[in-house]
């Protein structure tokens, strides 16, 4: 029988919900910075592409994020803790070979952490080009990343208190910016109709391969489960309702701008920054940059937790683990910190722009999600005693969705070979 944890039964308060915003939604919450731009790319802008893209984003968030992670996967708490290795700890006695999806999932999740901070921070900083044309962004991004990793040894107990309020401001900004465009062109809401997703995937030339870009909207879903121990199931589920509304409103707002901006192609523009009023552009970029830093911090902390769990399961060599503050659960692993810093800076120098990073981002996390689905099926059958036919149906649906994303992301291997090598090295260490 699963042990209950007080973190799941504690009273939901405004303060606890704001804390949840600052801890777990950084990755998925900063996706509007680059997702629609990645979908449109250099293609001609038309109704099927724009509305189909929004429709795919909406239904991906419904199925992959809301149903699979927020509803189903959060049920699998290991004494209040979440994450793929905690899930493995719950089911490992039901099959010796389950160690394979556990290690593979953990490996790809850690490898994904090499490119998430660079793409998030670079996407935000590149907005400065609208205010200060020709300003070199690469040095700024490297300085921010380096400062972030240097700061890790001191812990985030004090500054962590502002993460929640900053992310609350960020999501409110997403909501207002999106709504300001929707009220101008309300007809774009019809993009939520799954018919447009069907049109994009089956009728639009090369539409299926656009799933590789659509997937970027849900890459942060795994973090919702990984950070279960920090926030609790109830806080995640309630706060997700607010976050989802803000995200969708912004995506639809960007689509409204795309449908009425008057140009055949994006011409290098980012829809996210185009819907920000000129008078608010600099404050908006500053808020976006802070949100991207918080998103990166959450991922770095998650990497420490992942390695700590791997050490406890004898999946990773024993390395120095420090506790920089008295805050429960906060750890710092110098060797992992150095590894992530080198990987992130290398990614910035190699790709040079967020557009190039988009072409490589998402491949690893599709594998993590498929491995989570495999482990989750054993949890539902053997721990929750769900009907096997029901579980097989669930696995089939999510397996089909995730395998489609995986196939669409395979074309990214060409630009992802260095990170593929990094992932292989991590897998060999484990």
Regions found by a protein language model. Give the residues of each.
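The structured alpha-helical core of multi-pass membrane proteins
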Residues: 1-430
């Amino acid at each position: 029988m699963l042990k209950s944890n007080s973190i799941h039964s504690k009273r939901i308060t405004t303060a606890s919900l704001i804390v949840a915003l600052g801890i777990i939604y950084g990755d998925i919450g900063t996706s509007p910075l680059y997702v629609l731009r990645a979908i449109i790319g250099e293609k001609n802008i038309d109704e099927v592409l724009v509305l189909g893209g929004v429709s795919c984003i909406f239904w991906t968030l419904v199925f992959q994020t809301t149903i699979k992670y927020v509803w189903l996967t959060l049920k699998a708490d290991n004494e209040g803790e979440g994450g793929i290795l905690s899930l493995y700890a719950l089911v490992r006695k039901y099959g010796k070979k389950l160690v394979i999806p556990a290690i593979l999932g953990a490996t790809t999740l850690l490898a994904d952490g090499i490119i998430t901070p660079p793409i998030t921070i670079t996407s935000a900083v590149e907005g400065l080009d609208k205010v200060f044309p020709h300003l070199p962004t690469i040095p700024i991004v490297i300085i921010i990343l380096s400062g972030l990793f240097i700061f890790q040894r001191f812990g985030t107990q004090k500054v962590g208190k502002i993460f929640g309020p900053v992310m609350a401001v960020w999501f409110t900004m997403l909501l207002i910016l999106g709504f300001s465009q929707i009220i101008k062109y309300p007809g774009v809401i019809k993009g939520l109709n799954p018919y447009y997703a069907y049109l994009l995937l089956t009728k639009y030339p090369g539409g299926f391969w656009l799933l590789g870009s659509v997937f970027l909207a849900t890459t942060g879903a795994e973090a919702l489960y990984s950070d279960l121990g920090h926030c609790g199931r109830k806080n995640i589920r309630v706060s997700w309702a607010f976050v989802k509304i803000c995200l969708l409103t912004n995506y639809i707002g960007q689509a409204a701008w795309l449908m009425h901006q008057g140009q055949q192609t994006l011409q290098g523009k980012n829809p996210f920054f185009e819907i920000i009023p000129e008078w608010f552009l600099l404050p908006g970029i500053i808020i976006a940059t802070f949100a991207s830093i918080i998103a990166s911090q959450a991922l770095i902390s998650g990497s420490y937790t992942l390695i700590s769990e791997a050490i406890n399961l004898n999946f990773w060599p024993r390395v120095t683990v420090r506790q920089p503050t008295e805050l429960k659960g906060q750890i710092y692993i110098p060797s992992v910190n150095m590894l992530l810093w080198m990987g992130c800076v290398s990614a910035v120098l190699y790709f040079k722009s967020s557009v190039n990073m988009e072409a490589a981002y998402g491949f690893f996390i599709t594998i993590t999600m498929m491995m989570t689905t495999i482990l989750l099926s054993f949890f539902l059958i053997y721990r929750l005693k769900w009907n096997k036919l029901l579980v097989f149906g669930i696995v089939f649906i999510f397996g089909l969705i995730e395998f489609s994303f995986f196939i669409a992301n395979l074309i990214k291997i060409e630009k992802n070979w260095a990170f593929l090598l990094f992932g292989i090295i991590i897998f060999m260490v484990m």
